[in-house]
Amino acid sequence: MVKRPNILWVSFEDCYPHFGCYGDKVARTPSLDQLAAEGALWTRAFSTAPVCSPARSGVITGMYPVSIGTHHHRTGSGERIGSLAYSYEAVIPHYVKCFSEYLRADGYYCSNNAKTDYQFAPPITAWDDCGATGHWRNRPDTDDSFFAVFNLGQTHESNMWEEKNGEPVWPELDFDLESIEVPPYFPDTKKVRESIARNYMNIEFADRQLGELMRALEEDGLADNTIVFVWTDHGPMPRGKRWPYDSGIRSPLIVRWPDGLPGGTVRDELVSTIDLAPTVMSLCGVEMPRHMQGRAFLGAKAEAPREYVYAARDRYDEMYDTVRAVRDKRFKYIRHY
C-alpha cells in the first residue's frame, strides 16, 4: 500500500512576496529561493481578505468569509456574552468545518503551531495538537501521515515598528537603506526606508525558520514524501494590510511536491487562498464537501483555473469601511460602499 503524502504548511504572516525567488533584489531569502527552485511558484495568488481573521477563516474552511459570517475583524470588546461565544467571534453555519477535521477523520495527524485566529472559535476536533509546541514529531505513531501547520509570526506588521513592548524590534538595521525601493504611494523618507528595512529583516528571520523546518524533514527522512506549501494571509504595511489592493491581498505561493511538480516552475493562473483547503484534500485523497467554495489546483481533483478571484473588506476594529474587489489576470475592480 502506497503511503499517502504528508503536508507541511508554512505561513508567513502579513507578507507580500518580497522574496528573491519573486525577483526582489534586496531580499535575502535562500530557503524560500531553494524551495521555489525545487518546486513551483505562483505569480497570481490572492487572499480573500486583507486582514488576519477573515482571511484565515477562509483558509481553514475553504469558504469565502462573507459566506460564513466571518468577514468582520475584532468587532467587539472581547468579553464573553453570558455562556455564549466571545463577542468578537462569529458563529459559523453548522455544516461548515475546519478542513483539518476531514483530514483527521480520514486518519491524518493534524498539528498547528500555533496561531488560529479564525474569527470563530476552533472546535476541539480541529487539531490533534495545537499550540506553541505543535509539531509532526509529536504524533504517537510515526507511520501516520500528517498535516502540519507552522505560522511564522516574525513577519507580522507589529514587528515593523521601531519598538515593541518597550524594546527595539531590531537594534540595528542590517540593510542598505539606499538599496530599498520605496513604493510610489509612500513618502520617500528615512523613517519609511527604515520600516521597509525592518520588514526585510523579519522576512530573512522567517526564512531561516523555514530552513530549520526543511532540515527537520530531512533529518526525519520525510522530505521525499512531504508536500510543502508556503503562503501568507495578506500583505503588510499601510495600503497593504486591511485594504484589498494588490499590496494587501497578493500572496506568495510556493509548493514543493517531489515527483509531482517540476523544479523551477512558474505558474500564472489565478489562485485564491480558499483554494488551499480543497487542494490539500485533493492531494491527500480526502473527499471534499459539496458546499466548499474553494477549488483544488493540484492533485486528483484539480479543477480548471479560475477566471476571477474575489476579496472583501468589512468592519475592522473601529473602522467600518466596506469594500468589495474582483480581479482577473489583468484588471481589478474595487467597489466602495
Regions found by a protein language model. Give the residues of each.
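Formylglycine-dependent sulfatase
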Residues: 1-337
